[in-house]
Amino acid sequence: ARIPALLENLQTLLENTATKPDLGRPRLPIDRVFSLTGFGTVVTGTLLDGSFSVGDEVVSLPEGLNGRIRGLQTHNQKLQKAFPGSRTALNLVGIEKSQLIRGSVIARPGTYSPTALLDVHFRYLPDAPFELRHNTQVKIFIGSAERAGNVRLLGKDILKPGEQAFLQIKLDSPVVAARGDRLIVR
């Protein structure tokens, strides 16, 4: 008796879940990269901000390598087009597995630029164990990338747990980020 009710509740949730917006600027932060015999380079991740289609020209960032989508899948289904919010596998031509890493981003050429300087609105957790000082070394997690960097507090030298502030994070190596992206600072 509980299973039908559960299924009905799940169906209601699915029907009321908003679809991810298609902003026309697709990007796929790579969480896995591998090579399959007879196919070549395959990358996986969650597609954001736009759609990819078979045949699309793409670039890997921050590497700046150009390629093309030979094939794509979502949940083991071959498709001609993948939409925002879907877990997607891209079979790439022109980019080798050895040239990509977790945290790289596949995008359309000319739509994103890698950056090593992030301007953020930061909310410091109330139960953080220490104050955050200007120029503190941190790790950030954004998309599927992990990077080291330093915090530059704007207008103050110390941020106490529970406080909010605008700050800059100067990264040791570039990432692809868009306005409104969320990140984790450790």
Question: Language-model segments: which ranges?
Answer:
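Conserved catalytic-core segments of large NTP-driven translation/proteostasis enzymes
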Residues: 1-128, 165
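C-terminal effector modules of nucleic-acid-centric enzymes and ribosome-associated factors
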Residues: 95-186
